[in-house]
Regions:
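Glycine-rich, basic loop-to-helix element that forms the pyrophosphate-binding segment
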Residues: 66-82
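Donor-binding/catalytic cores of nucleotide-activated saccharide
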Residues: 71, 94-205, 213, 217-229
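Short aromatic/hydrophobic "clamp" motif used to bind/position activated sugar donors
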Residues: 87
């Protein structure tokens, strides 16, 4: 009998915290498959912990060991090995709320039994801030109908802080394979591609107003730490260019809500890239900013380019006296309010 869901857990030197993540996933029982992808860990006991869980729970846990390929290759490896109807990535320093997980899986079981399983299941996620012990939830009650099947026609407007992220989605595994997505190796921030590229293949969705995913944030070495993002801005640019290239948004003109959301997502990616290039502040970074907008212009249609220029992404590319100071200041205020990194 097919598993209801495959959880992929990319692990790289994660021994200090991965057990907590795995234990929350085990609460799903035999409905779930847990794929622990050891991404060439060498500094701690991560490989042994993966093998330990696979031996202890042979009908649930798979241990996959690969040469280091980065987070994206861990996700790719999970998709290659997944046998579940649905696929969800859970980073090894994050976890799922077990009560919410049981409710989500029960609902999915019911929908599958009725023959109405959605292509995409969406839930809330919670930022867990280690530095001050606070948390805040990103929910979508103003965007999606609750507790029923819907399509793109019924999707509302997203606020800038409301993007769908890897934390909030469960895709049907078939959709991920159908779209042909292969995440780039040795690149951070590929979770944006994971959410974005399959969207045109999604015909049905379901939203549950449950705080399922717990996103641990605040480690000094974390990829979303501001100083780390400035150092890795070239990887952010690589992901943004991949997203520019992976879908033809003009082909979606008859799906206005889907196209509008994908333009919104692309504009956010352009804005993030701009801001971290401004934070870098070097002449080289300024040139990369110019090149990124030129890349967008050359690799999309005039209508897509114009739409992004007139959005939040365009605001971060304005030029006026002290514009860089104003834009970075706006980012600092937003960061303080929304606490997104």
């Amino acid at each position: 009998m097919q598993k209801l869901i495959s959880f992929a857990v990319p692990c790289y030197n994660s021994a200090a915290y991965m057990r907590h993540c795995i234990e929350t996933l085990l609460s799903a029982g035999e409905q779930a498959e847990i794929i622990l992808v050891d991404d060439g860990s060498t500094k701690d006991g991560t490989p042994a912990i993966c093998d330990e869980y696979a031996a202890k729970y042979p009908t649930i846990v798979k241990a996959v060991h690969q040469e280091n390929g980065g987070h994206g290759e861990g996700v790719n490896q999970g998709i290659r090995n997944a046998t579940g109807l649905y696929y969800k990535v859970v980073d090894s320093d994050d976890w799922l709320d077990t009560d919410a997980l049981k409710k989500v899986l029960h609902r999915l079981q019911t929908l599958v039994a009725r023959g109405t399983a959605p292509d995409l299941m969406i839930c809330n996620y919670v930022y867990e801030h280690v530095e001050d012990g606070t948390s805040h939830t990103v929910r979508y009650t103003n965007v999606f109908p609750k507790d029923r099947l819907f399509d793109w026609v019924h999707v509302g407007h997203f606020r800038p802080d409301q993007n769908l992220l890897m934390h909030s989605v469960m895709y049907r595994t078939e959709v991920l394979r159908q779209c042909g997505m292969v995440l780039p190796k040795h690149t951070f921030y590929v979770d944006n591609i994971f959410v974005y590229q399959p969207l045109p293949y999604v015909k049905s969705m379901y939203y549950m107003d449950l705080d399922l995913y717990r996103y641990f944030i605040g480690r000094a070495d974390q990829s979303v730490n501001e100083s780390v993002m400035v150092k890795r801005v070239d990887q952010q640019l690589r992901v943004t260019k991949h997203m520019i290239d992976c879908q033809d948004l003009d082909a979606l003109k008859n799906q206005k809500r889907l196209r509008a959301y994908m333009l919104h997502y692309l504009s956010i990616m352009m804005a993030i890239s701009d801001i971290f290039l401004l934070l870098d502040g070097s002449a080289e970074a300024r040139e990369k900013k110019i090149q990124l907008w030129q890349y967008l212009k050359e690799h999309t249609s005039p209508s897509v380019y114009r739409a992004v220029r007139l959005s939040l992404g365009g605001i971060t590319n304005l030029h006026f006296p002290k514009s860089d100071t104003v834009i970075v200041g706006g980012y600092r205020i937003a960061r303080k309010i929304f606490k997104f990194n």
